């Protein structure tokens, strides 16, 4: 006991020095000043986090006309002026005068209308920057930055979180990480939790998370999937915008690798939480807060690359309702049912009707009347008188001669006509 006392005193002094040197939020990032040795079991129905366990946790609260404040989303403090959160928190609520941000809190009062007390700090919103390509239908690029005023003072319970190094890549594998927030402790809770909750979650392979019986292709390459296949432990409504944090393998710092974005229900089997990965947006963050400010909050020792940069692909093409998953609500479009093993072939389409004729053809000319069959060929070139004489001779059964030709005529017996009188 005597030998351990100096060590404990040194730890307290070290934390005090870090807090003092970090008054301008320019000191080391991702340091947990206080930790629960047992750890919180889960956010949904779990245990409370220790005060100062996650010093970069921020409560984003709607500020009403009568000065009441209502917790809406979580966020991560990056430095004395900037907070990282989710873009969908500001849909329909992007007026800077409607927001107040609370720092260094373990417990918050829903609907509070009184100024916060130390060590808590409250700040106004100077600017809200939503990603230019944020898609509210698919929750693509669900990331935003909030500039606060006046700048925050870091200290015993307030400190900046870390962001991944450029060489880190997307978080993958069976790594255990943490989530925290003031969200609902059960899916149908009447309001968010007043106590900051924490939970340990596992990273889930994106291909498994996107499989047919899970999210069926709705998870994008810039997302991180975290939770458990059986559910039971998850983020919930009110945790949106809060951090997904993984411990650096070479340091004691925690890195914000994801932003709570969306999910179907809370803690359901095969419906884990979906987070916006921070690594693909490092350049975007640097363009807003400055490259030097970003370098200040990146891990000192870059880990070896784990994945290549994600390919750019168009947003998910399934039609989804424009209604947002507010407070981490389930996306309104239900998962499409799994198709049966064998789909019947569709019936053949009927043949198209024959095209109408261009124009009716004229009827063919009538065939010439048949010539009367006769074994007697009349001479050609005879005058009417001679032809008449020839006809008379034929009727009489005589032979006709025109002086040049001699013709034998067959006699045709005609029946005698009898009078009916």
Swiss-Prot record:
Propeptide positions: 344-421
Pfam name, any one: Trypsin
PROSITE patterns: TRYPSIN_DOM, TRYPSIN_HIS, TRYPSIN_SER
Annotated region (Disordered), positions in chain: 297-316, 327-383, 397-421
UniProt organism field: Homo sapiens
Regulation: Inhibited by SERPINA5.
Protein's name in the database: Acrosin
GO MF terms, alphabetically ordered: amidase activity; copper ion binding; D-mannose binding; DNA binding; fucose binding; protease binding; serine-type endopeptidase activity; serine-type peptidase activity
EC number(s) recorded for this UniProt protein: 3.4.21.10
Domain Peptidase S1: 43-290
GO-annotated cellular components: acrosomal matrix; extracellular region; Golgi-associated vesicle; nucleus; protein-containing complex
Start-end of Low complexity biased regions: 412-421
Gene encoding the protein: ACR
Pro residues composition bias: residue spans: 301-316, 328-372
């Amino acid at each position: 006991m005597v030998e351990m006392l100096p060590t404990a005193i040194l730890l307290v002094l070290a934390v005090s020095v870090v807090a003092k040197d970090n008054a301008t939020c320019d000191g080391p990032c991702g340091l947990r000043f206080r930790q629960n040795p047992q750890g919180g079991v889960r956010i949904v129905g779990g245990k409370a986090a220790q005060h100062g366990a996650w010093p970069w946790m921020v409560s984003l609260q709607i500020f009403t006309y009568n000065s009441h404040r209502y917790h809406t989303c979580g966020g991560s403090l990056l430095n004395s002026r900037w907070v990282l959160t989710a873009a969908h928190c500001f849909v329909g609520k992007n007026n800077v005068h409607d927001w107040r941000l609370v720092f260094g809190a373990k417990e918050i009062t829903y609907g509070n209308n009184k100024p916060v007390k130390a060590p808590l700090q409250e700040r106004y919103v100077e600017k809200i920057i939503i990603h230019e390509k944020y898609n509210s239908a698919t929750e693509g690029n669900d990331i935003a930055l909030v500039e606060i005023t006046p700048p925050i003072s870091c200290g015993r319970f307030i400190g900046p979180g870390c962001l991944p190094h450029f060489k880190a890549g997307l978080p993958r594998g069976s790594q255990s990480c943490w989530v925290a927030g003031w969200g609902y402790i059960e899916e149908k809770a009447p309001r968010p939790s007043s106590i900051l909750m924490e939970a340990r979650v596992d990273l889930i392979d994106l291909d498994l998370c996107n499989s047919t019986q899970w999210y069926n292709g709705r998870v994008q390459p810039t997302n991180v999937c975290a939770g458990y296949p059986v559910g039971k432990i998850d983020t919930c409504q009110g945790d949106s915008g809060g951090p997904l944090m993984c411990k650096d393998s070479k340091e004691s710092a925690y890195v914000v690798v994801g932003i709570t974005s969306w999910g179907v229900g809370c803690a359901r089997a095969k419906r884990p939480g979906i987070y916006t990965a921070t690594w693909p947006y490092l350049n975007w963050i640097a363009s807003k807060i400055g490259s030097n400010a970003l370098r200040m909050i990146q891990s000192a020792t870059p880990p070896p690359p784990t994945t290549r940069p994600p390919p750019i692909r168009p947003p998910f093409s399934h039609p989804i309702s424009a209604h947002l998953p507010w407070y981490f609500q389930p996306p309104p479009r239900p998962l499409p049912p799994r198709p049966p093993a064998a789909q019947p072939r569709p019936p053949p389409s009927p043949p198209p009707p024959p095209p109408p004729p261009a124009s009716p053809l004229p009827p063919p000319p009538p065939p010439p009347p048949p010539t009367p069959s006769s074994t007697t060929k009349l001479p050609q070139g005879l005058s009417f008188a001679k032809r008449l004489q020839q006809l008379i001779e034929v009727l009489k059964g005589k032979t006709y001669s025109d002086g040049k030709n001699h013709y034998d005529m067959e006699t045709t017996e005609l029946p005698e006509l009898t009078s009916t009188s």
